Amino acid sequence: FLMNFDEIINRKNTHSVKWDMMEELYGVSKENGIPMWVADMDFRPPKCISDSIKKMYDHGIYGYFGDDKDYLKSIHWWLKHRHNWDIDPSWVFTTHGLVNGTSMAIQTYSDPGDGVVLFTPIYYVFFKQIKEGGREVLECPLVNNKGHYELDFEYYDSLMKGNEKVLVLSSPHNPSGRVWTQKELTEIASFAQRHDLVVVSDEIHNDLIMPGYKHIPM
């Protein structure tokens, strides 16, 4: 799993959203700008991953994929090894990514006109997903305590209108980087239970944790 973090790879003019669309989206030249606006790394993946992809490519046939037992086994092993979370592989439902999966969950557990709770600031795409689906965003602002974002459930309780059906949680929190504690996650669960909310937990950054912190799956 060795990686070379010193290798500089030029991704400009490769149809890279991160680099080639900076000017179109933000008016910043890709030649001079620093694209810190999206979570997209410029490092090659570990060789074992590239080799596996190349093996599939070299086979030359790209038909429908099935028989995902190895895939599910790998997910089970990683979550147990990394987070001590012993899942049942039957719980896994594969989507086309975070945005697609979150949209599907919101549409499944709410109806047009219902409210969706967000602890803000949060990943901006969630606002678009909710509004385009005909739902209403209810912002529950995090408290910025000298650069440390905190939750205020007494205030959030007062904001609830009664039509909320879903809480979209970012854990670890994007953009602040907060890793929610066991106590905070328990309070979030209690808040959701009080207001009969389905929690949709975005944990895409769960493996990017600084030393001294522990991610706890929701």
Stretches found by the model and what they are:
Residues 4-97, 104:
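N-terminal small-domain helix-loop-helix segment of the aminotransferase-like
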Residues 115, 197-198:
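Short glycine-centered segments of the SAM/dcSAM-binding site in methyltransferase folds
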Residues 62-190, 207-208, 212-218:
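Conserved core of the PLP fold type I
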